[in-house]
């Protein structure tokens, strides 16, 4: 247990993860792969994007929750380089495509 993590940070993490889980539930209800993601600006706590997979609905193999959050977050912040001050909450380990986008 990290003693430096305060209760408010843990509560925020739990809140954002619950939002991601809600997105995953929405995906499941639409027969999509049940993955959800939420992108949060670390400094302000502002939610920049919240998505679920829509690969089937959009007939787009890149319409993963993580990719959609990265795209919307970059647009909201004025470019992908500004994503460094964000946290991405995802309901499972990202695939190689999404991991590459997140690490870039």
Residues of each region from the PLM?
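Low-complexity, intrinsically disordered short peptide segments enriched in small/polar/basic residues
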Residues: 2, 30-32, 67
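Short, contiguous pre-domain boundary segments
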Residues: 1-8
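Zn2+-dependent cytidine deaminase-like catalytic core
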Residues: 43, 49-104
